From Swiss-Prot:
The keyword ATP-binding does not apply. A purine D-ribonucleoside binds at E219, N261. CDD domains: PNP-EcPNPII_like. It comes from Saccharomyces cerevisiae (strain ATCC 204508 / S288c) (Baker's yeast). Pathway: Purine metabolism; purine nucleoside salvage. PANTHER family: METHYLTHIOADENOSINE/PURINE NUCLEOSIDE PHOSPHORYLASE, PURINE NUCLEOSIDE PHOSPHORYLASE-RELATED. Keywords: Acetylation, Glycosyltransferase, Phosphoprotein, Transferase. The purine nucleoside phosphorylases catalyze the phosphorolytic breakdown of the N-glycosidic bond in the beta-(deoxy)ribonucleoside molecules, with the formation of the corresponding free purine bases and pentose-1-phosphate. Cleaves guanosine and inosine. This is Purine nucleoside phosphorylase. Its EC number is 2.4.2.1. Present with 1630 molecules/cell in log phase SD medium. The modification Phosphoserine is found at S275.
Length: 311
């Protein structure tokens, strides 16, 4: 059975979810001082849900809507992704925060993983996407807990036919054939580096190409070597589908990776080698991803909040 919905089915699902969220928010727009429709969506990556602590707790307090309550939304099943929409204000700017994202490897279709963006676009107001992720470092200069501002991407599943815009086009949102040569907004990237300097963050902030793979397995040595040869600086299992759909909707995009582990590109141990490299060397785990997310989380939170003050 095809997982591709026709335009009417997509629109029906989007409209139903948007109506549910709007009904929850409407009383707050009417009765809460300074509660405004969000202009920016922030998506929190693995272990980076602490960004929500930067939401104003009063004037106005945040409004939380669990994914599982919203028609058509899927619940995140991955540790480090709580699964809530949070509407509020960050550094004086109205925002909606996805505390936990959806992944294809959880069994979701690409329409389902990017569904929140379609819904928020239908509701209006949101025009910016700030997306964060935990990624493996491919570039030899990158170390665990470094940061990388994404300026381009490699969409490996997309090149093989698994693309978020595959199927009937939603003409009201964007064009059938979308140009992505400048998917990551230059002015927002400049703003990120400006705030990094102003905050005097000691953690390195690189600029590079993110490679999207479907997961859930971490990369083999040969795959990591291939990605490096193709020009990838980091690799992860998210972000690119959301970026593509946001650009399809005409949003500006800023994307930030936290390098939580370094990928192994050396050849595997040989059965003919009398002193092989230990097999455990360089092996990535999700626990490592979450732990390094905690280590760097304060810098990520402060950086995102500083950027929000300019939006």
């Amino acid at each position: 059975m095809s997982d591709i919905l026709n335009v009417s089915q997509q629109r029906e699902a989007i409209t139903k979810a948007a109506a549910y969220i709007s009904a929850i928010l409407e009383p707050h727009f009417k009765n809460t001082t300074n509660f405004e429709p969000p202009r920016t969506l922030i998506i929190c990556g693995s272990g980076l849900g602490g960004i929500s602590t930067k939401l104003s707790r009063d004037n106005p307090p945040p409004v939380t809507v669990p994914y599982q309550d919203i028609p058509g939304f899927k619940k995140s099943t991955v540790p480090g992704h709580s699964g809530t929409l949070m509407f509020g204000s960050m550094n004086g700017s109205p925002v909606v925060l996805m505390n936990g994202r959806l992944h294809g490897y959880e069994g979701n279709t690409l329409f389902e993983t990017t569904f929140p963006i379609r819904v928020l676009n239908h509701m209006g107001h949101v025009r910016n996407l700030i997306v964060t992720n935990a990624a493996g470092g491919i570039n030899a200069k990158y170390q665990a807990c470094d940061l990388m501002c994404i300026y381009d991407h490699l969409n490996i599943p997309g090149l093989a036919g698994q693309h978020p815009l595959r199927g009937p086009n939603l003409d009201e949102d964007g064009p059938r054939f979308l140009a992505l040569s400048d998917a990551y907004d230059l002015e927002l990237r400049k703003l990120l580096f400006k705030k990094w300097k102003e905050l005097k963050i000691q953690r390195p902030l690189h600029e590079g190409t993110y490679t999207f793979v479907s997961g859930p397995t971490f990369e083999t040595r040969a795959e990591s070597k291939m990605i490096r040869m193709l020009g990838g600086d980091a690799v992860g299992m998210s972000t690119v589908p959301e970026v593509i759909v946001a650009r399809h909707c005409g949003w500006r995009v800023l994307a930030l990776s936290l390098i939580t582990n370094t990928c192994v590109v050396d050849s595997p141990a040989s059965a003919l080698d009398e002193s092989p490299v230990p097999l455990e060397k360089g092996k990535a785990t999700h626990a490592e991803v979450l732990e390094n997310g905690k280590i760097a989380s304060n810098d990520v939170q402060n950086l995102i909040a500083a950027v929000m003050g300019e939006l």
